[in-house]
Every structure is written in C-alpha cells, then in structure tokens.
C-alpha cells in the first residue's frame, strides 16, 4: 500500500512539473515573416524608419511612381517634426471650436465639436481640424525616360528584411536588371539607397505643397507656393 501511495505521489509531482521552456528564436520568428512583393501593387508599398522618421517606397525601392500608389498606401516621407499650417486670415481662436458640456463630473467641460450650421464656429472647427497637418518632406525616386511606364518594370522581387531594416528591390527595366537597397538611419532623419545597374539612372527630388487632407497622399502639385 505504501509503495502504491508513493508511486501515485511521484506521478502527481511529475504531472505538475512543467517542462523547461525553450528560448524563442527571435531571428527566425522575425525573418520568416518578412513581406515580399512581386508586382507594382498600390496596397503593397514598404517602409523603413526609426520611430521618428519614415520613408515609404514602391516596387523600385524608391518613390519612382507615386501616382500609382496615390489611392492605395501612398509613398510618404514624413517625420515627427515636419508639420505645416495653412494661413489663418480670419484669426480663428481655439475656444471658438469648443462647446461646454456636462459630462456628469459636477462641472461643465469644454469639448471640441464639428458644427453643421454654416457659421463662424463651423469655420473655426474646420480650420482646427485641418491645422496643423503632417508635411510630406519630398519625393525621392529614379529619374527615368519620359516614356517609361510602371508596367515596364518587370520581374519584380522585393522584400523587407525586418531584422536588419533593409528593403531589397530587384527588377528589370527594358531588359536591364536593377538592384536597389534602401535603409533608414536608426537615430537620424536620414535614408540611404544603393543602386546596382548596368545602365546609369538619375535621382529625382520633388517637393509637394501639403493638402491638409485626412486620407490622401499629402501632395498638392497645383499650388503656386
């Protein structure tokens, strides 16, 4: 009987003892989820950044065809410090966009509203809902011949190495293979790209005026300023 009780006790202790947990292979966990892109897809843009600054690219590894991604996931270059406000010629005050409400705390509190009636309060609310807005710092892409179209970019093989923060973009353009590596500085608002190709390619810089929109590419190319 004693032997039986002893055996049952040891069995119970063994059942309650959890096996030693294995360490997580973080590198394998991250790298097996690296996103891959094989087409010029407006919903498949990739980004590199450092938490304070980010740069989003198309399938070329730069921002060569921003118009293709305009209505998808736009190609942005934005930072935590890059903000802009439109002029305030009517001199709207913040308090003009606030209304007192009783939330049951024993006193009235100011709350930002969006009036529907067309009066000064609505205009003030509309202005403060738009301003300030994040600024697109500029488009940086390949300078290609005018007749080159997005469909001319073939054999796309692009991946984001999330462990090292590198976007590798391989493609052919007019039978010329290209390889572009895109990175962001881990602490500064800087990006770098390495281009390998048999044919020389230039780099273009375009600086848009902001739109103040909520769901657009933040690029106004019609403004004179």
Regions inferred by a protein language model and the residue ranges of each:
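Beta-sandwich/jelly-roll carbohydrate-recognition scaffolds of carbohydrate-active enzymes
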Residues: 21-225
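C-terminal motif of bacterial Sec signal peptides marking the signal peptidase cleavage site
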Residues: 14-15
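Sec-dependent signal peptide recognition
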Residues: 1-8
């Amino acid at each position: 009987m004693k032997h039986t009780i002893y055996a049952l006790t040891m069995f119970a202790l063994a059942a309650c003892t959890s096996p030693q947990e294995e360490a997580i292979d973080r590198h394998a966990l991250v790298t097996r989820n690296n996103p891959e892109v094989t087409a010029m897809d407006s919903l498949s843009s990739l980004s590199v950044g450092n938490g304070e600054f980010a740069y989003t690219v198309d399938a070329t590894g730069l921002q060569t065809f921003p118009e293709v991604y305009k209505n998808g996931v736009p190609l942005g270059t934005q930072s935590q410090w890059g903000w802009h406000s439109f002029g305030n010629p009517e001199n709207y005050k913040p308090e003009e966009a606030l209304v007192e409400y009783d939330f049951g705390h024993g006193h009235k509190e100011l709350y930002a509203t969006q009036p529907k009636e067309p009066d000064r309060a609505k205009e003030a609310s509309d202005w403060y809902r738009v301003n300030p807005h994040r600024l697109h710092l500029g488009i940086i892409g390949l300078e290609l011949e005018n007749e080159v179209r997005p469909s001319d970019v073939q054999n796309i093989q692009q991946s984001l190495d999330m462990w090292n923060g590198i976007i590798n973009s391989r493609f052919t353009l007019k039978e010329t293979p290209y390889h572009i590596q895109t990175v962001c500085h881990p602490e500064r608002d800087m990006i770098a790209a390495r281009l390998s190709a048999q044919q020389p390619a230039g780099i273009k810089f375009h600086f848009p005026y902001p739109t103040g929109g909520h769901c657009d590419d933040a690029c106004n190319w019609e403004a004179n300023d």
